[in-house]
Amino acid sequence: MAENKTKETNESVDDFLNSIEHEGKKADSFRILEMMKDITGLPPKKWGDAMIGFGNYHYKYKSGHEGDIFQVGFSPRKSYLSFYLFYGYKHHPLMTKLGKHKGGKACLNINKLADVDEDILYKLIEFGFLSSAGGDNPYAKMESC
């Protein structure tokens, strides 16, 4: 069975973010880092080449393939900031209030924080984290939307 490419590393998250050349993207990345620390209460970890993740989620498919990934995370890509949220965020009612964004198969992409409502983004990250933690109704665990 193929091994996961994206694994937790021991690399410094701060060093990685400080290596970002674009000052705006660097500042946004540090702001997102603080948001996710606040939401999760967990330390950030570098995953793979360019992802920052919080928490650990073990998955297993019917095929028998299993692995570990972070519960929520983000990546400061060259063209955009990618957010890795648990499945279900795309249909969250707050998505219509977020602002300028694009959705990928498993991620939410924005160009910069100024393009979105940070309070809404915060709540969507919170939703993703609580959803990945299990439970019947992640909405019930959230502060009011």
What are these regions (language model features)?
Residues M1-C145:
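Charge-dense, helix-prone N-terminal extensions
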